[in-house]
Swiss-Prot record:
Cell wall formation. It comes from Bacillus cytotoxicus (strain DSM 22905 / CIP 110041 / 391-98 / NVH 391-98). Residues 141-346 form the ATP-grasp domain. Its cofactor is Mg(2+); Mn(2+). GO terms for biological process: cell wall organization; peptidoglycan biosynthetic process; regulation of cell shape. Belongs to the D-alanine--D-alanine ligase family. Its EC number is 6.3.2.4. Pathway: Cell wall biogenesis; peptidoglycan biosynthesis. ATP binds at residues 174-229. This is D-alanine--D-alanine ligase. Pfam families: Dala_Dala_lig_C, Dala_Dala_lig_N. Mg(2+) 2 binds at E313, N315. Binds 2 magnesium or manganese ions per subunit. It is found in: Cytoplasm.
Length: 362
């Protein structure tokens, strides 16, 4: 059997660089090396692309995935924007499909997806549109509003306008949303830069912090409810996993809880009614289709005590770390971690073949 040459793309110029490394390590451990040739492609925190030797055998630490040195450096495109083909002497190293294990800006936001589209290489996950819209919480929520999905009230700000009149921004939040509220960078995941604000002093500090990570921020009303999540898998005919619940020991599920402490309980499947499950799964698919999703998403919801469902956000490239909800949801749905990764690769190839049917000449 001919092995699929799989390019694992990880790292990235993003605050979520370390999350990506953890995801890549977990994926490598799960991949069947009898079926796949694993070719590591590392993007440093400075944005330099590095291609390493084919992975054979076990990788035990993220440090082993961090490359350096001119020997490994590559340029994905030339300065003339002409895509660089593989040299004739290295045709055997050409990649069949790319698995981008990138989180945050410059990876999960459509930029790399656009590059891969230009290179005409199959890749796992969402395309340019869904990735870009899914990264920007303001754009995402605008799309959800247009699709008629129930969500929390929100408002947004850009740094340049806020700097000119901070008082006006704070007053707008207090009038439109009140306290408590959540302040978030618009284009970042993994709960980086998110703060819950109970008064003006906390609001001011939260704005300062969020604007360190993005030029645009979103402020949302506080919804009191259980945090539930569901996985979506597929292309044009997506399916949902069982619903899971996050029970954080802290006040909300922040970056440290997600990736460092593991300081949460995951209940899978969530102890909710069949009707609530159906509503959450229905809205997850509606959100997926509104974004024109492909491959996978994880949809996050709030479920209030009176049974009302609010969509919070969609993650277009959920993590695969040991603490990650997405693979756990599918394991409880009947799809093991290795099977899940293989299905994502299959979906990537399927979508690429479908795109080849498009006529580009008249």
């Amino acid at each position: 059997m001919t092995k699929i040459k799989l390019g694992l793309l990880y790292g990235g110029k993003s605050a979520e660089h370390q999350v990506s490394l953890q995801t890549a390590l977990a994926a490598i451990k799960a991949l069947n090396q009898e079926k796949f040739e694993i070719h590591p492609i590392y993007i440093t925190e400075q944005g330099q692309w590095m291609r390493g030797e084919r992975i054979e055998g076990e990788v035990t630490s993220v440090q082993a995935l961090q490359m350096s040195g001119e020997a490994n450096a590559i340029s994905p495109v030339s300065l003339s924007t002409e895509i660089i083909p593989a040299p004739a002497s290295k045709q055997e190293e050409a990649i069949d499909v790319i698995f981008p294990l990138l989180h945050g800006p410059n990876g999960e936001d459509g930029t790399v997806q656009g590059l891969l589209e230009l290179m005409n290489i199959p890749y796992v996950g969402n395309g340019v549109l869904a990735s870009a819209a899914g990264m920007d919480k303001v754009v995402m929520k605008n799309i959800f509003a247009e699709a008629g999905l129930n969500q929390a009230k929100y408002t947004s700000f850009v740094r340049s306008v806020w700097e000119k009149n901070r008082e006006e921004a704070y007053e707008k939040v207090e009038e439109a949303l009140g306290y408590p509220c959540f302040v978030k960078p618009a284009n970042l995941g993994s709960s980086v830069g998110i703060n819950k604000c109970k008064d003006r002093e906390e609001l001011e500090k939260a704005f300062e912090e969020a604007f360190q990570f993005d030029r645009k921020i979103i402020v949302e009303e506080n919804i009191i409810g259980r945090e539930v999540e569901v996985g979506v898998l597929g292309n044009d005919d997506p399916k949902c996993s069982v619903v899971g619940e996050i029970v954080p020991k802290k006040e909300f599920y922040d970056y440290k809880s997600k990736y460092i402490d593991g300081d949460t309980a995951l209940i899978i499947p969530a102890e909710i009614t069949e009707e609530e499950t159906a509503t959450i799964q229905r809205d997850a698919i509606r959100a997926f289709q509104a974004l024109d999703g492909a491959g996978l998403t994880r949809a996050d919801f709030f479920l209030t005590k009176d049974g009302e469902v609010y969509i919070n956000e969609v993650n277009t490239m959920p993590g695969f770390t040991p603490f990650s909800m997405f693979p756990l949801l599918w394991q409880h749905t009947g799809l093991s971690y290795p099977e899940l990764i293989e299905e994502l690769i299959r979906l990537a190839i399927e979508r690429h073949k479908e795109k080849q049917k498009i006529k580009y000449t008249i």
